[in-house]
């Protein structure tokens, strides 16, 4: 057995955070507010919005995601020294690129085959698990979508959550410390992140007691007061 004491463990060390929202809401730009040196892996090649910042970006060939992910997971452990944060920018885009790649490699050259769907479930969880084992803080972004859920009372709702196939979405969100929906307040034009979920929005926060946060202070863990996210 490998027993270790949790007495001096800080639950915010090596955090794993996902923020999701509609395209253009500012998910990638949230990397500006991470503390320490940051490396971005741009699955959707949108890293140019971070131009002028002291943030590094890895090149990613979205036409060949399987090969690129194999390369990254082999090379990253050797280049992360000095980095505090890793940003996996847009796993929704990664999912789409992977299925396009599989369709291209199919017998028809375009259509996905049945085994692709079960293959993605195993592949994606293994990839995320490998990323999550890296000794840095990790921020993941995704697009949003609405999915039908059934409450404990039997009522059905459409709930916003990260745009990923159902076969991986729940497991992925379970592995992640914080899942928040980024929103824009139409009155103030300020961006915030919802950190407490309900029937209409999936969100969770197991790092502190905040239910919402302005994007600028999202990574200031330990705040006991619920700040106005300016997103409701």
PLM feature segments, named:
Residues 45, 62-64, 143, 184, ...:
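Residues that form or immediately flank small-molecule/cofactor binding pockets and catalytic motifs
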Residues 38-40, 138, 179-181:
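Short, well-ordered beta-strand core segments
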Residues 10, 17-20, 36, 118-119, ...:
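A short linear-motif detector with a strong N-terminal bias
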Residues 130, 146-232:
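Conserved GTP-binding G-domain of TRAFAC-class P-loop NTPases and closely related GTPase folds
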Residues 2-88, 92-97:
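Conserved P-loop
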Residues 85, 90-170:
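P-loop NTPase motor core
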Residues 81, 134, 174:
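Structured loop/turn residues at beta-strand edges in well-structured enzyme cores
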């Amino acid at each position: 057995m490998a027993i270790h004491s949790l007495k001096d463990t800080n639950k915010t060390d090596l955090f794993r955070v996902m923020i999701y929202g509609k395209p253009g809401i500012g998910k990638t730009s949230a990397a500006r507010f991470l503390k320490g040196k940051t490396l971005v892996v741009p699955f959707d090649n949108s890293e140019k919005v971070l131009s002028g910042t002291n943030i590094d970006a890895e090149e990613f060939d979205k036409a060949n995601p399987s090969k690129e992910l194999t390369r990254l997971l082999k090379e990253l452990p050797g280049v992360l020294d000095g980095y505090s944060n890793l940003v996996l920018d847009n796993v929704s885009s990664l999912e789409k690129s992977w299925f396009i790649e599989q369709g291209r490699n199919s017998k028809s050259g375009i259509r996905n085959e049945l085994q692709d769907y079960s293959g993605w479930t195993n592949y994606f969880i293994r990839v995320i698990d490998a990323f999550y084992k890296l000794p840095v803080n990790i921020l993941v972004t995704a697009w949003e979508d609405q999915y039908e859920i059934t409450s404990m009372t039997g009522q059905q709702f459409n709930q916003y959550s990260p745009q990923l196939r159902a076969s991986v979405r729940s497991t992925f969100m379970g592995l992640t410390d914080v899942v928040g929906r980024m929103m824009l307040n139409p009155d103030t034009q300020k961006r915030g992140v919802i950190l407490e979920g309900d029937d209409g929005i999936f969100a969770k926060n197991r790092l502190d007691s905040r239910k919402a946060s302005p994007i600028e202070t999202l990574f200031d863990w330990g705040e006991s007061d619920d700040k106005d996210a300016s997103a409701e």
